Amino acid sequence: MIEAQPFLAPDFQSKEPRELALLSIVTQSFFQPFSVDDNLLVILTALTSGSGVGFNRAMLFRTDGDKLRGGKWLGPRSPEEARMIWEVLSTPGLGYLEIIEHNRWLLSRGADAMSGKIAPLEFSLTRDNLTIPVTAVAKKELLLIREASREPLVDARFLETIGVEEFLCVPLLFQNEVMGEIILDNAFSRKPIQPKDVKLAGLCGLMAANYIYTASLHQKMVEMERMAALGEMAMFITHQIRNPLTTIGGFTDQLLNGQADEAKRRRNLEIIRGEIRRLENIVFELGHFLKFDPKRPEPFDLKAELRSVLEAMEPRAAAENREIRSEIDGLLPPVLGDPTAVGEVLRNLIINAFEASPAGSRIEVCAERKDASWVVVGVKDAGHGIPPEARAKLFTPFFTTKERGMGLGLLYIKRVMDACGGTIEVESEAGQGTTFRLGFRSQEEGRPET
Amino acid sequence: MKRILIVEDEEALCLLYKEELSAEGYEVTTARDAEQALEILRRERFDLIVTDIRMPGRDGVELITEIMGLRKEVPIIINTAYQSYRDDFMTWAADAYVIKSSSLDELKAKIRDLLSR
C-alpha cells in the first residue's frame, strides 16, 4: 500500500517530545514563502512558545559589518501580558501558522516598545571586546549568565535593558562566520534555565545561523543577477545608440565639407533625419518599458478591444499587402486585465506578425472560449518560424532578431499577461509560421446561462 | 589601388564607409552579413578587412575566426559599437579594434596605418 503523508503537520501534538515539535516548527517555516524577517521570527517563536523550548523572551542581534546590532525582541512586556499570551498559545489544536501570526502581531505592536528598546544597542565586534553579550560570538561559545549584576563583564547598558539576572547567550555561527546572537531569558516565570533548554537553544542557534547565511547568499545572488542584467542592458543600449550616432556624424561631416551637390545634400539630410527618429524611438521604447505599471486586472470586453485593434490595423494591412483573417467568438465572456495594456499587447503581436510575414500572405487572428475559466487569443503569422535556440530567448530583455529592434516587445507582452494572471505560449515550426497564444482568465459569473 | 572589404549590417553605414573610403582612394566592397562576406572572400582578394561583430545571422567573432583561416596575411579591423568585445580574446587576433563614433578619423587613420606597413 502506498500512502502519501503530509510534510506539514497542521498542528502540534502535545504528546510529541518538544525537541521534535521545535524542529518541526523551524524546518516547516522554511517551506513557507516567508520573508527572511518572518523566518527569523519563527525561530524566535520556536524558542519562546510553550510547545517549543519555552523561554519567556528572545532577543535577536544581527551582525552588521563589525558591529552586533539589536534587531527583534520577542516576548510579553509584563507578567499580565505573559499570562494572557500563554493562555492564547495553549489553546488546543492551535497550529504553528497561527502562533507565527500571533507573534507577528505581537512584534508589530511591540515594535516601539520591546524591539524599540534593543534597536539602539550596538556592540563593537573587535577581538578585545570581551563584554557580555559580545563574548559569546567572540569566543564562539554558548554562555549562561547568572547573577548578571555581580558580573563586571556584563555591559551595563545591556543589563539595564534586559533587566534580569539570568540569561543565555547563543552565538549564531556558520562555519567561522558570525551571523548574530540570540539572548534568551525567563523574565516572568523566573524558572532557572535548564541544561536541556541550553542544548535545544544551541540547536536553534545553528539553524538560525545557517538560515541567515543561506538567505544572505541568496540575496547576493539576486543582486549579482540584477547587476548582470543591468550590464547587458547598458551594453545593448550603447550599441543601439552608437550606430545611429556614427551614421549621423559621418553624413554631417560630408555636408560640412561642402563637396556634396544638392541631391547628395538632400539624401544626407534624409538619412540623418531617419537616424534621429530611430534614436527617438529607442528613447520612447525604453521609457515605455521602464515605466510599465499595469492597472489592477478588471473584467473587460476582449472582443470589442480586439475588433477595434483589428479595425485600426486594416489600412496598414492594405498598404503593405497583407490579409488579416479573424475569427472571433461572438459569445466571449469578459476577461480580466488592463484593457489599455491588453490593447497594446494585441497591436504589438499583430505588428510582429506583419513584420514576420512576406507580402501577399495572410495573418490569422482568432479568439475563443477554451473552457469555463479561460479565453484564448491566437495570432498566427506566415513567416519562417522561430528556430529553437531563439525560441528559448524570446522573453529575454534585449534579445532581438530585428535589425532595429530593442528586444523589449515580447517581454512587455509577457509582463502584461503576468500582471493579469494570464499566459503566453509560442508554437513555431520551421516554414510553418509562428502562433502566439494569449490565455486570459475569464469572468463568467456575470454571464447569463445560455 | 588598395582593396578593402567592409562587413557591416547597417545599410546607411555601408553607404557612408563606401563613400568616405573611396574618397580616400581605396576600392571598397561591402557585405551586409557574415555569410556574404565569406562568399566574397572565397573568390576575391583584399588588402584589408573591416568588420562589425554583432550582426544578424552568424556572429562576427565566429566570422573573424573563419576569415583568419581564409585571409592569410590580410589585416583585420574590428569596427563595432560594442566596447566589451575588446576583452574577448577572440578579438585579439584582429590588428585593430575601433569603436564606432561620430567621427571616422580613427578608422581612417588605422586603415592608413595598416596599409602602409
Predicted feature residues:
Chain B
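Active-site residues of response regulator receiver
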Residues: 52
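Hydrophobic/aromatic residues positioned on beta-strands within the core alpha/beta folds
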Residues: 77-79
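Receiver (REC) domain active-site loop signature in two-component systems and cognate sites
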Residues: 55
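Short amphipathic alpha-helix used as the core "switch/output" element in two-component signaling
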Residues: 39, 61-72
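Charged docking surfaces used in two-component/phosphorelay signaling
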Residues: 15-23
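Acidic, metal-coordinating helix/loop segments flanking the phosphotransfer/catalytic sites
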Residues: 30-48
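Acidic catalytic/metal-coordinating carboxylates
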Residues: 33, 59-62
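Conserved acidic carboxylate
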Residues: 8
